[in-house]
């Protein structure tokens, strides 16, 4: 047998596969595979993406193994060369004889969970894991009108950390619009350009867990000293510091030290600084020292581009009308769009269905209409402020104007009824009030609802708007 004749060998395999799978499955998962080389009883093939690899391993591993043995010979191995997405691990090898999960190259795992760095001694730059996700970079961040400003500012920071006026850089926007992607992209680019920089990405939740552990273990000074050695600190979901006074106080000192020593800070949040309740004023002031940039929900055109990019990276093909339909009907977040693509591919594969408009409508209808969005305090504040024609910040002031007081009390009452937050938390988020103030507000609103029909109609109107948002 001529080992270099990889094309002939793969064509033999395709003939076997054609007889064992429906045409749609063959065209989707096997036709795009390109044979590269055959040597040492190993067939190397090129596949379009990591996603492709995962589907082949999960759904077709037995078929591939049997096909290789039948068409080429017992003990034949298959090696995948993953293409398209530059962040994928190339040359993933799967020994199909031994296990459908054994790989010759083990990807470096992205550190997550509650693993904390050692605070007793700051590791050298080369030993410090930045906790960045390499799949989030500028190359695969799709730009549109809704995120153009944030993208431009982020790139400027990455090119010259702590050397621009954008320090700190505060990125905010709804869930799933790309804040975490952009924050990671900044860190990844800085590591590429400045290998000697100590870059660290950490979620606000993990920072809080680490701080609590340091208090318990009497190592708080080590915790602070470690963070003060960082050159570029990225804190994701900073709103989670709300109401946690001691964590805020510790972060305040870390922030000051880093900023005063010419280090870059990047913060993300689901809301603008002006709407961050339960946060110390001195921190809020510092959040606004540099650049505050919003990532808005993606426009229809941007959603289409995101879908095309996702489909291309995964080595898939969707009809244009399917892409248009998804983009026009799934409008909450990028994460939702990518989830729909995966759901469509899964259903297409499992049930051997063509990817067409009917399939897309079935999937989208199930996701969009069965989704019950929880009402948040932010939702309540937006609806109440709009109803009373108030600025969003007014409700958080100490104003005793009748309309402000009434709006604040109604917001507290609705938050008590529509969310799972305690009265103390509600008070922190709405005007930074205490538990007793919230109880008094709820009692006042409830009492007025019982005797005032016009007030009752007003609250019902606000509630109906809230339910529409949900």
From Swiss-Prot:
**Segment Domain II: which positions?**
89-130
CDD domains from the entry? AAA (cd00009), Bac_DnaA_C (cd06571)
Keywords attached to this Swiss-Prot or TrEMBL record, sorted alphabetically, are: ATP-binding, Cytoplasm, DNA replication, DNA-binding, Lipid-binding, Nucleotide-binding
Tell me the Gene Ontology biological-process terms attached to this UniProt entry: DNA replication; DNA replication initiation; regulation of DNA replication
Q: Which residues cross the membrane?
A: none
Q: Which residues bind ATP?
A: 176, 178-180
Stretches for region Domain III, AAA+ region: 131-348
| Domain of life the protein comes from | Bacteria
Q: Name one GO cellular component term.
A: cytoplasm
InterPro entries, per database record: AAA+_ATPase, Chromosome_initiator_DnaA, Chromosome_initiator_DnaA-like, Chromosome_initiator_DnaA_CS, DnaA_C, DnaA_dom, DnaA_N_dom, DnaA_N_sf
Residues covered by region (Domain IV, binds dsDNA) = 349-470
| UniProt subcellular location | Cytoplasm
Annotated spans, Domain I, interacts with DnaA modulators: 1-89
Q: Cross-referenced PROSITE patterns, in alphabetical order?
A: DNAA
Pfam families linked to this entry? Bac_DnaA, Bac_DnaA_C, DnaA_N
What does the record say about domains? Domain I is involved in oligomerization and binding regulators, domain II is flexibile and of varying length in different bacteria, domain III forms the AAA+ region, while domain IV binds dsDNA.
> Which HAMAP family does the record match to this protein?
DnaA_bact
Similarity annotation = Belongs to the DnaA family.
- Self-association and partners: Oligomerizes as a right-handed, spiral filament on DNA at oriC.
- What is the purpose of this protein? Plays an essential role in the initiation and regulation of chromosomal replication. ATP-DnaA binds to the origin of replication (oriC) to initiate formation of the DNA replication initiation complex once per cell cycle. Binds the DnaA box (a 9 base pair repeat at the origin) and separates the double-stranded (ds)DNA. Forms a right-handed helical filament on oriC DNA; dsDNA binds to the exterior of the filament while single-stranded (ss)DNA is stabiized in the filament's interior.
Query: Under what name is this protein listed?
Result: Chromosomal replication initiator protein DnaA
Species assigned in the record = Bacteroides thetaiotaomicron (strain ATCC 29148 / DSM 2079 / JCM 5827 / CCUG 10774 / NCTC 10582 / VPI-5482 / E50)
Q: Tell me the organism's taxonomic lineage.
A: Bacteria, Pseudomonadati, Bacteroidota, Bacteroidia, Bacteroidales
């Amino acid at each position: 047998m001529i080992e270099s004749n990889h094309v002939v060998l793969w064509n033999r395999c395709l003939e076997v596969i054609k007889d064992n799978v429906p045409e749609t499955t063959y065209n989707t998962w096997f036709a795009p595979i390109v044979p590269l080389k055959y040597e040492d009883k190993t067939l190397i093939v090129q596949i379009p993406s990591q996603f492709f690899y995962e589907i082949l391993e999960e759904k077709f591993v037995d078929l591939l193994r049997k096909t290789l043995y039948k068409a080429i010979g017992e003990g034949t191995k298959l090696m995948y060369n993953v293409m398209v997405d530059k962040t994928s691990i190339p040359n993933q090898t799967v020994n199909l004889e031994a296990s459908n999960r054994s790989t010759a190259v083990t990807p470096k795992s992205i550190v997550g969970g509650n693993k904390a760095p050692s605070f007793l001694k700051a590791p050298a730059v080369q030993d410090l894991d930045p906790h960045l996700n390499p799949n989030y970079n500028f190359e695969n961040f799709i730009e549109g009108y809704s995120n153009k400003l944030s993208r431009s500012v982020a790139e400027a920071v990455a090119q010259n950390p702590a050397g621009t006026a954008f320090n700190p850089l505060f990125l905010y926007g709804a869930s799933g619009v790309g804040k975490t992607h952009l924050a990671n992209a900044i860190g990844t680019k800085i590591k590429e350009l400045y290998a000697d920089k100590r870059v660290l990405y950490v979620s606000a939740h993990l920072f809080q867990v680490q701080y609590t552990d340091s208090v318990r273990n009497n190592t708080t000074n080590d915790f602070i000293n470690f963070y003060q050695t960082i050159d570029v600190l990225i804190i994701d979901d900073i709103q989670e510091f709300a109401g946690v006074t001691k964590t805020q106080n510790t972060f305040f000192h870390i922030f000051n030290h880093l900023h005063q020593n010419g280090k870059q800070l990047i913060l993300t949040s689901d809301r603008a600084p002006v709407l961050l309740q339960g946060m110390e004023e001195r921190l809020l002031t510092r959040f606004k020292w540099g650049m505050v940039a919003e990532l808005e929900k993606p426009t229809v055109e941007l959603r289409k581009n995101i879908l095309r990019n996702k489909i291309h990276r995964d080595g898939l093909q969707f009809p244009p009308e399917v892409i248009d339909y998804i983009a026009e009907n799934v409008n909450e977040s990028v994460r939702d769009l990518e989830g729909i693509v995966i759901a469509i591919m899964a259903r297409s594969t499992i049930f051997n269905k063509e990817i067409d408009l009917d399939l897309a409508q079935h999937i989208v209808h199930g996701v969009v209409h069965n989704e019950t969005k929880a009402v948040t305090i932010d939702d309540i504040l937006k609806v109440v402020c709009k109803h009373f024609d108030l600025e969003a910040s007014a409700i958080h002031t100490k104003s005793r104007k009748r309309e402000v007081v009434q709006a604040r009390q109604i917001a507290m009452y609705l938050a008590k009824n529509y969310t799972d937050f305690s009265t103390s938390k509600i008070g922190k988020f709405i005007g930074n009030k205490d538990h007793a103030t919230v109880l008094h507000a709820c009692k006042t609103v409830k009492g007025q609802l019982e005797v005032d029909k016009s007030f009752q109609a007003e609250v019902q109107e606000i509630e109906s708007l809230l339910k529409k948002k949900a």
